[in-house]
Swiss-Prot record:
Cysteine disulfide links: none
Keyword Cytoplasm on entry: yes
Domain ADF-H: 4-139, 177-313
GO molecular function: actin filament binding; actin monomer binding
Protein name as it appears in the record: Twinfilin-2-A
Listed Pfam families: Cofilin_ADF
Functional description taken from the UniProt entry: Actin-binding protein involved in motile and morphological processes. Inhibits actin polymerization, likely by sequestering G-actin.
UniProt subunit comment: Interacts with G-actin; ADP-actin form and capping protein (CP).
Biological processes, Gene Ontology terms: actin filament depolymerization; barbed-end actin filament capping; positive regulation of neuron projection development; regulation of lamellipodium assembly
Subcellular location(s) of the protein: Cytoplasm, Cytoskeleton; Cytoplasm, Perinuclear region
Species in which this protein is naturally found: Xenopus laevis
InterPro entries in the record: ADF-H (IPR002108), ADF-H/Gelsolin-like_dom_sf (IPR029006), Twinfilin (IPR028458)
Main location class: cytoplasm
Swiss-Prot/TrEMBL keywords: Actin-binding, Cytoplasm, Cytoskeleton, Repeat
Amino acid sequence: MAHQTGIHATPELKEFFAKARNGSIRLIKVVIEEEQLVLGSHKELKHAWEQDYDALIVPLLDESQPCYILYRLDSQNAQGYEWIFLSWSPDHSPVRLKMLYAATRATVKKEFGGGHIKDEIFGTLKEDVALSGYKKHVSLCAAPAPLTAAERELQEIKINEVKTEISVESKQQTLQGLSFPLRPEAEEAILLLKQKKINYIQLRLDLEKETVDLVHTKHTEIKDLPGRIPQDTARYHFFLYKHSHEGDHLESVVFIYSMPGYKCSIKERMLYSSCKNRLLDSVEQDFQLEIAKKIEIEDGAELTDEFLYDEVHPKQHAFKQAFAKPKGPAGKRGQKRLIKGPGENGEDS
């Protein structure tokens, strides 16, 4: 879970939330001021939600200031109207603000009422949270629940008596292509790592909610890495490996998949193994984060400076050519001599 900041909504904002949830308010903008959540602005209903969406939301997005936006849909559930929760964290905003807003996001949802929120979007660019971005998000979320697919596959494995070992050493994945969505906190951490504003990310799978969650982004030196690896559960790690190679200073992102063998359940091992490739595809393609090396380990003790260096810069084994017979001295050479062994001329030894 994200670290909580102790910031809460003002009484005025709480009162406005209660009024807005089932009233004629289409949009609520919430900002942090003086360590409190306050009402930034609001907009009334004008047209159907799709018509209002871009016209009301986009003008409120400041290029250097994060904010939260709650946008009311026209659909309802048992608790009332359904809302979209947008977390806006532009690239040009200060890192301190980004982290503050990321850590307070859960509080905003709780104060408003999580049961009213149908969808949640995180964006750093306007196209991320525009109507087209929201529809793309809905389309991705409409895929079959990954965990259900996993359970079906697991059942098929049992029926067909497939007895393939599932472990860190096994390169064959029984489940192909499972994809748990990244939580907004995890997405923001990846963006910060790409900008080299943090140097370490630890992610976990929430097997019940079927999401990839952020564990923490504590500053990590190489000597700290072994202690970051849990001994009883799997994790995904991204580490900005700073080192020198052939006289150049390099900063290489290394992905580490830690799986402590059979201390984890079969289900956990299967899901971590199956979600790994889709997670990496997303990080490399959607976030354009270049990963220099992907490593799988069982024990954090493996993560030494020498180990990382050899993984990122594997030793090149030169091709061994057959020994070439040296050429003789230049100039006139004597006649060739044929040396025969004893008995080869028909003589006795």
